[in-house]
Amino acid sequence: MVIQFGGLNKMSNSGLNMSRRIRRTPYTEKVIEAGVSGFTVVNHMLLPKSYKATVEEDYWHLSQNTQIWDVSCQRQVQIEGVDSEKLVELMSPRSIKHMPIGKCYYYPMIDENAGMINDPVLLKLSENKYWLSVADSDVLLWAKGLAVGRSLKVNIIEPDVYPLAIQGPKSEELMSSIFGQKIKKLKFFHFSFFEFEGTKQIIARSGYSKQDGFEIYLKGFGLGKKLWETIWEAGKEFNISPGCPNLIDRIEGGLLSLSLIHISEPTRPLY
């Protein structure tokens, strides 16, 4: 199959029929240049699924070096307004009453039968503003439905944000070479603002792997190519490679996937 991206043709066994219903990311062209061998689709957006010849080769590189991952498919659901805390509380058994600004929570979302519908990372940006960095389901529609049904005073949107992950034991040295020594003080599952090309961008110490790593919540599609190239050039010193969620690494870390593989609607958070 030929997958076309703005003049770039990529032979793939992914089985995808490309259309406007499948969204590209700011990094898609760089991902193709880096040698991606296939894609899957999460939240209606492309997610690279393989680069290396084997998953074992990818695992050993990830556990010893650093990788750059296009995880733009982690769409953000922004909930803002005077009732934002009330709505976010309603969607999960985990309380956010004492959640500080700048913190990330693993946040299992449940339906009316307490079944799992998503397991996002929750970020608190201000007293009345939250981001849900979601796995593969339509959380935006679920949140809007609850807000309308409860007559809550909130504004719910999908912001122009495209996460890029830097994972692996050398990720801290790589990131500090670009964003400064301040980033070394960032604790696990916390975030802060860092400057890039004259803009303020959120970076969290988190990621899909059990390795040390960071996620850059890039605001602005147009900055994607520059961000990738900046990290790639700086990363050559640290044996950087393109990557994607690795099944061996995730199983070792006890990191389950929503997407109806390990966790689905009949699954309760206490199981």
Predicted features and spans:
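Conserved adenylation A10 loop of the ANL superfamily
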Residues: 70, 209, 263
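Acidic, proline/glycine-enriched N-terminal capping motif
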Residues: 2-107, 115
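Acidic, low-complexity central loop/insert segments
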Residues: 118-257
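Single conserved hydrophobic/aromatic residue that forms the stacking wall/gate
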Residues: 261-271
